[in-house]
């Protein structure tokens, strides 16, 4: 069970002869839309599935034209534009207890962390479907604390500001990191590194210090 990367990262509960509960090191909070507008529109949709039960009730099973007309009509709502920010934390120490039982192999490795970072910064863009059309990853902010640090960072949801107006020259979203930069300055003795991965085609970053490593998402 613990050889599976998703279990090592997000945890699991296994009920069998012996009950095992793994509290995952990775915890992700609900997303908060930090864009100024929340314009939601709705549109009418029809179900692509045949309504066989209705056909039988009306004894029209042998009439294909009637069957094709039996559709379910509903509505779906969509957000015109939103920028959702999810705070998350990674605490490898969550696996200490279970590793004492089954061995060191269940601890998170550097390779595991790299796979997590790739998934977080590209997963939404890769997951393309009708319901997810138009959704793309925009940014990943990664703050690594020094070995042995017991510091608990606050949610970044209130420390990263998306300006109300896009850049007038190129229409890019402007993210202001002033509040987060000030917070990290206060705790810099506990911080090992700060990395920001962002989509350079859609974003502009402000008030990041030169110590912050910036990469294309």
Model-assigned labels for residue ranges:
Residues 1-217:
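Basic polyanion-binding and macromolecular-assembly surfaces
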């Amino acid at each position: 069970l613990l050889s599976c990367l998703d279990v090592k990262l997000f945890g699991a509960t296994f009920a069998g002869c012996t009950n095992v509960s793994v509290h995952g090191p990775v915890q992700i909070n609900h997303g908060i839309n930090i864009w100024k507008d929340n314009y939601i529109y709705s549109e009418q949709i029809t179900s692509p599935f045949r309504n066989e039960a209705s056909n039988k009730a009306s004894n029209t099973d042998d009439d294909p034209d009637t069957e094709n007309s039996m559709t379910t009509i509903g509505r779906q709502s969509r957000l015109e534009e939103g920028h959702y920010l999810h705070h998350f934390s990674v605490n490898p120490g969550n696996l200490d207890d279970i590793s004492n039982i089954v061995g060191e192999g269940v601890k998170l490795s550097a390779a595991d962390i790299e796979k997590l970072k790739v998934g977080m910064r590209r997963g939404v863009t890769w997951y393309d479907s009708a319901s997810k059309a138009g959704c793309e990853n925009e940014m990943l902010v990664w703050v690594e604390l020094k070995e042995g640090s017991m510091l608990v960072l606050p949610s970044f949801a209130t420390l990263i500001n998306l300006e109300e107006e896009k850049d007038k020259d190129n229409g890019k979203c402007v993210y202001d990191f002033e509040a987060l930069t000030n917070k990290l300055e206060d705790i810099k003795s506990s911080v090992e590194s700060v990395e920001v991965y962002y989509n350079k085609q859609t974003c502009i970053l402000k008030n990041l210090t030169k110590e912050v490593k910036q990469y294309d998402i």
